[in-house]
């Protein structure tokens, strides 16, 4: 079952992840179902004393068209296969189709938001710039998920500046 949240409910439920979302609904921009953890699973992976801590099992993302908001929680374990899967959770075509259901003669605001491990990125614009908004959202999502703080290590931090190659001398 797909849930579109309207008006003040969207703001009140902006941080809520506990709802059942179906995949590929007729108006949904998302191609994957909601994968929110169960209440028990959520409690096992979160510290109740720190309400700002994200669940390390995945990330949340949303698309908003005017007053209508579609949300997903997706599992992500920071492997290449998992990254490839979640990058396909929506496409420019699926977003365009979903957004077109809410467009009238006037321009409406469109917003993409993603939150992963305490970092939140929001990209917004008007419905006339939706294609550019989708491109920026895809780039933001990919960069955020690939640059997880634990995995960030540049060539410089390993003592080898970019563009420098190391050659070993063959022994005789």
From Swiss-Prot:
InterPro entries registered for this protein in UniProt: Tombusvirus_p19, VP19_sf
Coiled-coil ranges per UniProt: none
Keyword RNA-binding recorded: yes
Gene Ontology biological process terms in this record: symbiont-mediated suppression of host innate immune response
Compositionally skewed regions (Basic and acidic residues) per UniProt: 1-20
Entry GO terms, CC: virion component
Disulphide bridges, residue numbers: none
Molecular functions per Gene Ontology: RNA binding
Protein keywords: Host-virus interaction, Inhibition of host innate immune response by virus, RNA-binding, Suppressor of RNA silencing, Viral immunoevasion
Location of the region described as Disordered in the Swiss-Prot/TrEMBL record: 1-37
Family as reported in the entry's similarity comment: Belongs to the tombusvirus protein p19 family.
Subunit relationships: Homodimer.
Known role: Viral suppressor of RNA silencing which binds specifically to silencing RNAs (siRNAs). Acts as a molecular caliper to specifically select siRNAs based on the length of the duplex region of the RNA.
Protein name: RNA silencing suppressor p19
Organism encoding this protein: Tomato bushy stunt virus (strain Ja9) (TBSV)
């Amino acid at each position: 079952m797909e849930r579109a949240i309207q008006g003040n409910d969207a703001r009140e439920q902006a941080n809520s992840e506990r709802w059942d979302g179906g995949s590929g609904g007729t108006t949904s921009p998302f191609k994957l179902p909601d994968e929110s953890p169960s209440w028990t699973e959520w409690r096992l992976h979160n510290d109740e004393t720190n309400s700002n801590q994200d669940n390390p099992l995945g990330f949340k993302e949303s698309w908003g068209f005017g007053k209508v908001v579609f949300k997903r929680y997706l599992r992500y374990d920071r492997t290449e296969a998992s990254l490839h899967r979640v990058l396909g959770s929506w496409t420019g075509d699926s977003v365009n189709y979903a957004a077109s259901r809410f467009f009238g003669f006037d321009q409406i605001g469109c917003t993409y938001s993603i939150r992963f491990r305490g970092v939140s990125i929001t990209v917004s614009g008007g419905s006339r710039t939706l294609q550019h908004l989708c491109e920026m959202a895809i780039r933001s999502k990919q960069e955020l998920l690939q640059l997880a703080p634990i995995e960030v290590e540049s060539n410089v931090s390993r003592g080898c500046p970019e563009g420098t190659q190391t050659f070993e001398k063959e022994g005789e």
